[in-house]
Amino acid sequence: MKTYRLSPSGRRSAIVLMIGALLIWMFALWTLRITLATSSDPSAGLFQAFQENLDRGLSAGQVLPALLMVVLLIATPLVLWGILEEWGAQYTPTDAGLQFTSFGIALNCPWDRITGIRRLEENADEPLDAIMVSDDLSSQIKNPLVRWLHRQSCGDRRLLIYPGLENRDDLLQEIRARSGLTDVQSALSQE
């Protein structure tokens, strides 16, 4: 049994993306603090300045950036989870099916449940493919938070084959062969 993981360059790319996402999250937190908690009194604390702004009313110039920063504060951890899941992804073809493991995730996909392979990013340097399955694989994840995060990243009836995976073409070929997919079925699942 061979296990397929991200290549060293794929891991480096994932780390750079995680650092970028963390910087965006810190920027959003800093901007939200500056937007909502500015005070004319330099010695005022964060909550005191925020309370003063609420008492006098927030302007549109404060509300709109604050809402955007709140969206970034919520969305960035979801993006981080997706990158972490990609960074830890391991695919192991076995006689029983394809095993996928990552942080807190262990999925077993029987070969007869694979219905197709869809290319999600056709024009990218390194394409992103999705294995389409007939069942919801995420129901195998016990932790409800990890299950929800996985569904947000991948969807419930597919398993992503990430770009940057070492020998990904060999893995895709083995998946097609073991699941009985023909090139016609793979092409149909791309539509």
Task: Please provide the spans of the model-predicted regions.
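Juxtamembrane/interfacial segments around transmembrane helices
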Residues: 59-75, 115-126
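Conserved beta-hairpin
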Residues: 72-117
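N-terminal membrane-targeting/pre-transmembrane regions
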Residues: 1-65, 184-191
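Short regulatory "switch" loops immediately downstream of catalytic or recognition motifs
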Residues: 29-42, 120-121, 133-142
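A membrane-cytosol interface segment of integral membrane proteins
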Residues: 123-191
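Generic detection of short hydrophobic beta-strand segments and adjacent strand-loop junctions
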Residues: 2-6, 109, 157-162
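Hydrophobic alpha-helical transmembrane segments of multipass integral membrane proteins
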Residues: 21-29, 69-80
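Hydrophobic beta-strand residues in large extracellular and virion-surface proteins
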Residues: 4-6, 98, 114-117, 131-133, ...
